[in-house]
Amino acid sequence: LMEPKILESVVTALLHTDFPETTHQGILDEVNLSGHVLPKQAVRDPHFRKSVMLAYEFRCAFCGYDGRINSRPVGIEAAHVKMHSKGGPDDVSNGIALCSLHHLLFDSGVLSLSDEVEILVSQYFLESDYDTPSSAMKLIGQLMRHPQPGYDLPAAEFLRWHRGNLFTEPARKRD
């Protein structure tokens, strides 16, 4: 195969250039490299997370999840709409607060948003049980929760980038 250090460098560069961080571990597992290459976390502006979380009041903009342990938010993350590695800024206009599940589905191309911030679900996404509380199918056609007054919705240019580069089209139609 390849020299381990070279392999790690190549894989790390590819992951950080072409894939959202939330998908790195799954990709490494899929190609049997999870024991050989450790995904490195990119350095981010800590103000981005704080600003996005405050804008969305520490709750998922898709489902409203707002779990806490000892008053500390858990399972809620600041997601970039346009990947940071593709020139997406660390700005609230490029961010959405999402629960861990919806962040992964958003970064994996399962979920996206229309210009009117209607939640889109890929036709290619399958679930075995649509009746579970966390079913992505329940989100089809719903409007995302807006940030609190004083904060803008995600910018249309970043939403279009997400749909054109990450979302697996076409979107499902509402029943």
Regions found by a protein language model. Give the residues of each.
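Charged, low-complexity surface segments at secondary-structure and domain boundaries
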Residues: 1, 33-39, 142-147
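Mixed-charge, low-complexity interaction segments
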Residues: 1-33, 116-122, 128-131, 136
